[in-house]
Amino acid sequence: MKKIVTTLVALAAMLTAGAQTKTNETKMTYHKVQVEDCNVFYREAGAKDTPTILLLHGFPSNSHMFRELMPELADEFHLIAPDFPSFGQTESPDREHFTYSFDHLARIVDKFTEQIGLTRFAMYVFDYGAPIGYRLAMWHPERITAIVSQNGNMYDEGLGKKWKARRAYWQNPTDELRKQFSSAYALETIIGQYTFGTPEGSVGPDGYSLDYYYVNLPGRAEMQNDLILDYRSNVALYPEFQQYLRTHQPPLLAVWGENDPSFIPAGAEAFRRDVPNAEIHFVPSGHFALESHHTEIARLMREFLKDNVYA
């Protein structure tokens, strides 16, 4: 009997140790690393010896948008989510000494991945994070194992009605129009981005409240105004992004909030034109679909990555 009890105690200790190790590997940790003039903040979860997913946020958000998704996938994947310069906790150098363009943000993210040792990874791209991620894919196609696009557009037909006014601004970027687009930083505008088209009561206030705080820190509005104007560089690159897909045929999953007025469902459906085997899914949500459907999106990602990349 004593031997049986001893064996059971030892087994329990092993199971407890295993559970603690798993918990340590899946918990969220927070870090900063210097890249050029920026101290880049990032979140990390999952064991480093598991397949890596780089998570690239949108406007006006930051890596906080992945707070629910990362723990759901950290048991099988290594997840990294940085904040871009002028977003979240990453330092925002003065505009006189730092160019706020999508190409420069992509260069920062590129150097960031190299500094923390990422050599092969899948990407989750959303909103502003999409043209940043697509640049990385064009520059280093050998590093990209798969793309998960959540309302991350690269097609003209994916641009909603609001982009008509943006295009007019890009063609005639007056100071008056620049000031008008500062309405994007108003609290009611940000709340609308989060809640439009989502099931009632499914979006908590934490995300949009935090975004409103960060985007209205001193100097950041003008940095964001620079990016609103420079978004035209992303649209100009759409043909090159599409050529990357046709040439390299990366495994591609598009998960779209079907009620998003900014990047409409046609943008998701267009992926099959360039990647015939792309998986396309729609969820009954809006632009920030993770807020209401993170569990479903995590499930789709897990199944897609295990079936197509890490089988």
For each predicted feature, which ranges?
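The serine-hydrolase catalytic nucleophile loop
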Residues: 59-69
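Alpha/beta-hydrolase active-site loop signature
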Residues: 60, 85-88, 154, 286-289
